[in-house]
Curated annotation (Swiss-Prot):
Classification via InterPro entries: Ankyrin_rpt, Ankyrin_rpt-contain_sf, Ion_trans_dom, TRP_dom, TRPC5_channel, TRPC_channel
One cellular component (GO) term of this entry: cation channel complex
Region of interest called Disordered, as start-end residue ranges on this chain: 766-794, 810-837
Keyword Cell membrane annotated: yes
Cytoplasmic topological segments: 1-325, 361-363, 420-433, 498-512, 625-973
Disease: Loss-of-function variants in TRPC5 may be involved in a mental disorder characterized by maladaptive behavior, anxiety, autism, postpartum depression, extreme food-seeking and hoarding behavior, hyperphagia and obesity.
Protein name (record): Short transient receptor potential channel 5
Organism field: Homo sapiens (Human)
Annotated Ca(2+) binding sites: E418, E421, N436, D439
């Protein structure tokens, strides 16, 4: 009775339960389809073939069915790299779909070749795409095979596709406003951006560039620059585009790594693009490719060791072993050349072709002479600032001093040099260099100073105390501008630090920090203007006059600061200097007793200091630290790139003489001017056509040289690409290691090998056909178990192989083997040595088959045993051998001559087997486990047992075969 009143208590903290069910149910596969896919997964060729044959007759299996992962039989075969089953499926016209894309993504080269060569027979019924299940489609509609292959960067697959003459859509320009781009963006902006990203990801593939581009280095340069610019427009995919841009830069650098001689390096760096307009086509040894690399900011390419070694050789031309000399010797040499630069310049003016004239044209000598000239200019600026020549300070328009007259030629030389540089390189290239902008500002200030001094000298002749001059007096403005230009001139010397390996990275870091300061100033100015407006609005009403202040001084520069926030400009100055602690707190006080106003003003002033000092200033320090660390992490590349730009400015023709000698016309200049004037204004008649023939000859020679240079360049590029591809494949194999795919491939190979050997030895039974239901199969398996062997019923489906009777012919070298003696129980030592003897046994089995190769026909179609039967009855093979030994008495009645195995009928063998002690045959169905995991584990266990049994049988067969006895053997493995 107590149980009637007993109530079970649920101690679970969550007593309510949520019923779960499958909301998006999918179509379940039939048992036959599961068995079909399972056979493809295991690599059972015979079963798959029989299933396909019966599907064509009975239509009981959908050969295009998919597993829960959305994989069809063809995709499973591709994933397992089972090309035999793939070919079998294609021969039966399975639906291909995205199989080619799937094979490309899995990088199965054999499958890609098979699918590319596959052509559906004419007249076959095509499976409509709409009837296939597209819910598992893994590829967007814009993905093509060549694009996917380029994404994987598989050289072999890309080569196969390029040989088929595939194409890739050409992406439009970054800011293209054509109808196609605008309409595509309006319809689906995400798809438009993704499609553009996929195209560029394919175009940036190193393997595709190496295969399809005539000039892969130039292609990588332009594509990397375009991707960098695109990352600034497509901010949503900025990281992806920057990664692709870096990939192109590394490809060009790696391609240059493969150069093995100075000749190859010179051919690469001196090659010029035929379509390049900014380079002179008459120059063939001006490092044109390197100039293009600098233009596109290919820092990795420029800083590559091979490139730097060639540049160093050209830079120190005429100074062999310069780097191995002591630093004292180097310093004395540079100082000597620097002091002699006026004489070298004069020698070049007189005779440019002389030894001294050619000596000053060397890049290193040119650099030393220009540096010495600039240092001389700075020294004269120092003399001018110290006022060595005493003048009357009260003269409103003073005449130029001797030092100022000496400075004037240098200023004119600087201006003339900048004009020539802008003329040669173009305005766009000129303004992209920040040092050129600094030179422009410096020269402008010097011109303004000279102009104002001339105005003051002409307009103001008298002398007047300086305290009485007006604020905007030309002399005062000229002196202020001259002081600013002196600062810029001194800072311009920092650009020469790039030539030094220690000061160069610091100079680059300083330039990067200036960008951070500009970014910081934008935010700081906004905060400054906001608080200046508020404080000025608050204290505008309390402005006092100067006569009311001590010493008649008004402003924050007085001994006692006052009226700090009376005007907007004064407020801006006060807040700026407060950052440096130069403003006192009492400036927030007012003469009237308005304590609330003072409190609000002090609070606003304190809040500004907190924001500007604690927040913004620390943010600036963090930004500058980040910039310095970024440069420090890539200091070598950044410095070498900046040094190369400095060196290249001295490699070019022209600009040989330093200021002020560059403003002196040389005889060569007069000769060029005379030729131009003669050809322009006094053209001569050419009745005989000599000039025309001369121009034609020069044009032909120039084009011939260009063709020869291009041919040499293509040969070098071909060699570089071959070396790069070989190195890429070698590195990929080295760094790949063992992955899960390798183990899956090994498992698939073992499974396929097992089924092939079973078919070869005839150890597989006739499975039942599809018409047998799964219940009947289980019942028949239970009846075949014999006495008491209780087997668990499992739902399984079998395929009828339908093999015909065939006879197997073999040489009469194998006699009947005697009954093996010894206990059948295996010790622990034997079980521990299973795997060690499996390898030699398989080798012996292969040797035995090779001996039969000339006489053995196709295996007989005896009933084949299943995998599960082999697992349960492992002693079946030994019992067959025992059965063959019992037939020894019958075989002795036969003659000792050669007896072929084909003379023994299958019925006689079966009758002899029934009269012997051989047990009942195993079940004749090939069970396909519904669980993939359980079937895989059973597969490995059964493979180990079968290998063990084969090994022992092969040892005994080889032993008897070696004795040379000739007797018939009838075995059934």
């Amino acid at each position: 009775m107590a149980q009637l009143y007993y109530k079970k208590v649920n101690y679970s903290p969550y007593r309510d339960r949520i019923p779960l069910q499958i909301v998006r149910a999918e179509t379940e596969l039939s048992a036959e389809e599961k068995a079909f896919l399972n056979a493809v997964e295991k690599g059972d060729y015979a079963t798959v073939k029989q299933a396909l044959q019966e599907a064509e007759i009975y239509y009981n299996v959908n050969i295009n069915c998919m597993d829960p992962l959305g994989r069809s039989a063809l995709l499973i075969a591709i994933e397992n790299e089972n090309l035999e089953i793939m070919e079998l499926l294609l021969n039966h016209s399975v639906y291909v779909g995205d199989a080619l894309l799937y094979a490309i993504r899995k990088e199965v080269v054999g499958a890609v070749e098979l699918l590319l060569s596959y052509r559906r027979p004419s007249g076959e019924k095509q499976v409509p795409t709409l009837m296939m299940d597209t819910q598992f489609s893994e590829f967007t509609p814009d993905i093509t095979p060549i694009m996917l292959a380029a994404h994987t960067n598989n050289y072999e697959i890309i080569k196969l596709l390029v040989q088929k003459r595939v194409t890739i859509p050409r992406p439009h320009q970054i800011r293209c406003n054509c109808v196609e781009c605008v309409s595509s963006s309006e319809v689906d902006s995400l798809r438009h951006s993704r499609s553009r990203l996929n195209i560029y990801k394919a175009l940036a593939s190193p393997s595709l560039i190496a295969l399809s581009s005539e000039d892969p280095i130039l292609t990588a340069f332009r594509l990397g620059w375009e991707l960098k610019e695109l990352s600034k427009v497509e901010n949503e995919f900025k990281a992806e585009y920057e990664e692709l841009s870096q990939q192109c830069k590394l490809f060009a650098k790696d391609l240059l790594d493969q150069a093995r001689s100075s000749r190859e390096l010179e051919i690469i760096l001196n090659h010029r693009d035929d379509h390049s307009e900014e380079l002179d086509p008459q120059k063939y040894h001006d490092l044109a490719k390197l100039k293009v690399a600098i233009k596109y900011h290919q820092k990795e390419f420029v800083a590559q060791p091979n490139c730097q070694q060639l540049l160093a050789t050209l830079w120190y031309d005429g100074f062999p072993g310069w780097r191995r000399k002591h630093w004292v010797v180097k310093l004395l040499t540079c100082m000597t050349i620097g002091f002699l630069f006026p004489m070298l310049s004069i020698a070049y003016l007189i005779s440019p072709r002389s030894n001294l004239g050619l000596f000053i044209k060397k890049p290193f000598i040119k650099f030393i002479c220009h540096t010495a000239s600039y240092l001389t200019f700075l020294f004269m600026l120092l003399l001018a600032s110290q006022h060595i020549v005493r003048t009357d300070l009260h003269v409103q328009g003073p005449p130029p001093t001797v030092v100022e007259w000496m400075i004037l030629p240098w200023v004119l030389g600087f201006i003339w040099g900048e004009i020539k540089e802008m003329w040669d390189g173009g305005f766009t290239e000129y303004i992209h260099d920040w040092w050129n902008l600094m030179d422009f500002a410096m020269n402008s200030l010097y011109l303004a100073t000279i102009s104002l001094k001339i105005v003051a000298y002409v307009k103001y002749n008298g002398s007047r105390p300086r305290e009485e001059w007006e604020m905007w007096h030309p002399t005062l403005i000229a002196e202020a501008l001259f002081a600013i230009s002196n600062i810029l001139s001194s800072l311009r010397l920092i650009s020469l630090f790039t030539a030094n390996s220690h000061l160069g990275p610091l100079q680059i870091s300083l330039g990067r920090m200036l960008l951070d300061i500009l970014k910081f100033l934008f935010i700081y100015c906004l905060v400054l203007l906001a608080f200046a407006n508020g404080l000025n609005q608050l204290y505008f009403y309390y402005e006092t006059r100067a006569i009311d202040e001590p010493n008649n001084c008004k402003g924050i520069r007085c001994e006692k600061q006052n009226n700090a926030f009376s005007t907007l400009f004064e407020t801006l100055q006060s807040l700026f200097w407060s950052v440096f602690g130069l403003l006192n707190l009492y400036v927030t006080n007012v003469k009237a007793r308005h304590e609330f106003t003072e409190f609000v003003g002090a609070t606003m002033f304190g809040t500004y200091n907190v924001i500007s000092l604690v927040v913004l200033l620390n943010m600036l320090i963090a930004m500058m630290n980040n910039s310095y660390q970024l440069i420090a992490d890539h200091a070598d590349i950044e410095w070498k790139f900046a040094r190369t730009k400095l060196w290249m400015s001295y490699f070019d023709e022209g600009g040989t003489l330093p200021p002020p000698f560059n403003i002196i016309p040389s005889p060569k200049s007069f000769l060029y001017l005379g030729n131009w004037f003669n050809n322009t204004f006094c053209p001569k008649r050419d009745p005989d056509g000599r000039r025309r023939r001369r121009n034609l000859r020069s044009f032909t020679e120039r084009n011939a040289d260009s063709l020869i240079q291009n041919q040499h360049y293509q040969e070098v590029i071909r060699n570089l690409v071959k070396r790069y591809v070989a190195a890429m494949i070698r590195n990929s194999k080295t760094h790949e290691g063992l992955t899960e795919e390798n183990f899956k491939e090994l498992k698939q190979d073992i499974s396929s090998f097992r089924y092939e050997v079973l078919d070869l030895l005839g150890n597989r039974k006739h499975p039942r056909s599809f018409s047998t239901s799964s219940t009947e199969l289980s019942q028949r398996d239970d009846n075949n178990d014999g006495s008491g062997g209780a087997r668990a019923k499992s739902k399984s489906v079998s395929f009828n192989l339908g093999c015909k009777k065939k006879t197997c012919h073999g040489p009469p070298l194998i006699r009947t083997m005697p009954r093996s003696s010894g206990a059948q129980g295996k010790s622990k030592a034997e079980s521990s040595s299973k795997r060690s003897f499996m390898g030699p046994s398989l080798k012996k089995l292969g040797l035995l088959f090779s001996k039969f190769n000339g006489h053995m026909s196709e295996p007989s179609s005896e009933p084949m045993y299943t995998i599960s039967d082999g697992i349960v009855q492992q002693h079946c093979m030994w019992q067959d051998i025992r059965y063959s030994q019992m037939e020894k008495g019958k075989a002795e009645a036969c003659s000792q001559s050669e007896i072929n195995l084909s003379e023994v009928e299958l019925g006689e063998v079966q009758g002899a087997a029934q009269s012997s002690e051989c047990p009942l045959a195993c079940s004749s169905s090939l069970h396909c486990a519904s669980s993939i995991c359980s079937s895989n584990s059973k597969l490995l266990d059964s493979s180990e047992d079968v290998f063990e049994t084969w090994g022992e049988a092969c040892d005994l067969l080889m032993h008897k075969w070696g004795d040379g006895q000739e007797e018939q053997v009838t075995t059934r493995l």
